[in-house]
């Protein structure tokens, strides 16, 4: 029997949502409420392929949820709010407390609040959404799905930093990793595409958007990932620096007179591709600039791809080989130029990719390797909301033994040719 699940991502002044029919994994509607708390809040919802926008006063998240539910009824997506049988909430940080998704209780709320010191900009906002939905829909399960949970299978040698050990014991300083819901979704889908059990596969997942992270997934479990204690670590990103020598922070402070917080702001918002080029963090802009001969843009693209390229080599060594490389997220799904730069030179480890196939894939699923390539290379559009909805069914105990799409797709594979 089909169930309607609401996947939610609450920000401090926004609420993104998707209403999904499960187990078919069919999108009913999606939308976003922006500028919550201001006089000109913006409510956007998709109805029958058309995007409808309304500007009104929305004072808080509870009011935003009520407006969203009323819109569902107005457009006959539901007859009553009881038609929604569960909600799933993206929560950025679960620390070591939450190695998997969990049904929200008062105790879970308190634990998420305690973890806010690890994600001060995100966890409190995520909680506002959870509390609004729990108040307005008290009879259904509300499941928290954490960006960090998927990476809790990393071994100590992957997540510990070479710092005094008591920093880990006392303050929880370690690598946590992020984008876990995306890495989990695309790795499962990759196994379906190649027609092999995920337990038998070594997968390198490249989530490349404005934020980017790489994950080594062995037998379906994350054993390492590029982001760290925060999403600032790892590869170069749109506005984030990625890894650098930590001694640069006091050096920059001394040279510029800036505080530590101000330097961190620069590393998060003024660095990466934006910092390198001085013009844009948008890869499309930089690709055009490079085509027209701008040297700094060309170097930035090469550097960006090189960092990802190195992680692939590192993670292949870590897993004693690789069976599948997956590209996902905005850049990974749409930029054949970056994919090509990343893959160039990996033939020595069995990666034989087809430039024509690579160039033809933009935002759609498929292979970009030659049929004879030992390592399969895939583009897989991510769908974190579907992954969240699956967890609502699983942890909210809503499964009435109707097979989920992931189960009846297990043997579906895509031909290489």
UniProtKB/Swiss-Prot annotation:
Pathway: Metabolic intermediate biosynthesis; acetyl-CoA biosynthesis; acetyl-CoA from acetate: step 1/2
Cofactor remark: Mg(2+). Can also accept Mn(2+).
GO BP terms, alphabetized: acetate metabolic process; acetyl-CoA biosynthetic process
Subcellular location(s) per record: Cytoplasm
InterPro entries: Ac/propionate_kinase, Aliphatic_acid_kin_short-chain, Aliphatic_acid_kinase_CS, ATPase_NBD
Principal localisation: cytoplasm
Chemical reaction(s) catalysed: acetate + ATP = acetyl phosphate + ADP
Residues bound to Mg(2+): 9, 384
Positions of the record's site feature: Transition state stabilizer: 179, 240
PANTHER family tied to this protein: ACETATE KINASE, ACETATE KINASE-RELATED
Membership in a protein family: Belongs to the acetokinase family.
UniProt protein name: Acetate kinase
Naturally occurring in which organism (per UniProt): Staphylococcus epidermidis (strain ATCC 35984 / DSM 28319 / BCRC 17069 / CCUG 31568 / BM 3577 / RP62A)
């Amino acid at each position: 029997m089909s169930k309607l699940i609401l996947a939610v991502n609450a920000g401090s002044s926004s609420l993104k949502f998707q209403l999904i029919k499960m187990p078919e994994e069919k999108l009913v509607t999606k939308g976003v409420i922006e500028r919550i708390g201001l006089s000109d809040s913006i409510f956007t919802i998709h109805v029958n392929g058309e995007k409808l926008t309304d500007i009104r006063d929305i004072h808080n998240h509870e009011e935003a949820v009520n407006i969203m539910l009323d819109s569902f009824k107005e457009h006959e997506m539901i007859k009553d709010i009881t038609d929604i049988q569960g909600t799933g909430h993206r929560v950025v940080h679960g620390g070591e407390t939450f190695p998997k998704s969990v049904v929200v209780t008062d105790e879970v709320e308190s634990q998420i609040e305690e973890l806010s010191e690890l994600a001060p900009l995100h966890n409190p906002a995520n909680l506002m959404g959870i509390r609004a939905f729990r108040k307005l829909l008290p009879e259904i399960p509300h499941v928290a799905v954490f960006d960090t949970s998927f990476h809790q299978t990393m071994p100590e040698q992957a997540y510990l930093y070479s710092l005094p050990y008591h920093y880990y014991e006392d303050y929880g300083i370690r690598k946590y990793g992020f984008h876990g819901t995306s890495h989990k979704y695309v790795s499962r889908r990759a196994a379906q595409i190649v027609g092999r059990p995920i337990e038998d596969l070594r997968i390198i997942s490249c989530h490349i958007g404005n934020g980017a992270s790489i994950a080594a997934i062995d037998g379906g479990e994350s054993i390492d990932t590029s982001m760290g204690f925060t999403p600032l670590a790892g590869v170069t990103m749109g506005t984030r620096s990625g890894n650098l020598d930590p001694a640069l922070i006091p050096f920059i402070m001394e040279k510029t007179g800036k505080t530590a917080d101000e330097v961190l702001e620069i590393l998060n918002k003024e660095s990466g591709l934006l910092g390198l080029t001085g013009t844009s963090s948008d890869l499309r802009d930089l690709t055009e600039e490079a085509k027209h001969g701008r040297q700094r843009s060309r170097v930035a693209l090469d550097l960006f791809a090189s960092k990802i390229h190195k992680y692939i080599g590192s993670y292949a060594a870590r897993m004693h080989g690789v069976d599948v490389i997956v590209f996902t997220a905005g850049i990974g799904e749409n930029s054949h130029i970056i994919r090509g730069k990343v893959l160039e030179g990996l033939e020595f480890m069995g990666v034989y990719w087809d430039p024509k196939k690579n160039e033809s894939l933009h935002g759609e699923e498929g292979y970009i390797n030659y049929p004879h390539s030992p390592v399969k290379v895939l583009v897989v559009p991510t769908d974190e909301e579907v992954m969240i909805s699956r967890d609502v069914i699983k942890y909210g105990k809503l499964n009435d033994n109707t097979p989920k799409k992931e189960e009846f797709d297990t043997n579906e594979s895509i031909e290489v040719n």
